Amino acid sequence: MNNIRKGDEVIVLTGRDKKRRGTVLARVDADHVLVEGVNVVKKHVKANPMANNPGGIVEKTLPIHISNVALFNPATGKGDRVGVKEVDGRKVRVFRSNGAVVGAKA
């Protein structure tokens, strides 16, 4: 069971975007995630008239390593580790600090 999934709200632990929060847009592979508004770089794109591309400077979101983000716990307002518990015969993700189910409406 994956600790971090698409749609989860995460907080960045290290790097240029430390303490910034965002939503996971995608899992790129087992070790990287795309987070909205995090690790955004400017890329210089050459114009290509054949492809109707004007070129210029484009902002692009790059993947960030999964070890550099933690699931955001709204109850504590901090990043938190995740565990797995069986509730009603189903495996669910729970926050380690308070045992609340991840994604449950409070």
From Swiss-Prot:
Gene3D superfamilies: 2.30.30.30. The keyword DNA-binding does not apply. Keywords: Ribonucleoprotein, Ribosomal protein, RNA-binding, rRNA-binding. One of its GO terms (cellular component) is ribonucleoprotein complex. GO terms for molecular function: rRNA binding; structural constituent of ribosome. It holds the Pfam family ribosomal_L24. GO terms for biological process: translation. InterPro entries: Rib_uL2_dom2 (IPR014722), Ribosomal_uL24 (IPR003256), Ribosomal_uL24_CS (IPR005825), Ribosomal_uL24_KOW (IPR041988), Translation_prot_SH3-like_sf (IPR008991). Part of the 50S ribosomal subunit. Belongs to the universal ribosomal protein uL24 family. One of two assembly initiator proteins, it binds directly to the 5'-end of the 23S rRNA, where it nucleates assembly of the 50S subunit. One of the proteins that surrounds the polypeptide exit tunnel on the outside of the subunit. PANTHER family: MITOCHONDRIAL RIBOSOMAL PROTEIN L24 (PTHR12903). HAMAP family: Ribosomal_uL24_B (MF_01326_B). This is Large ribosomal subunit protein uL24. The gene is rplX.
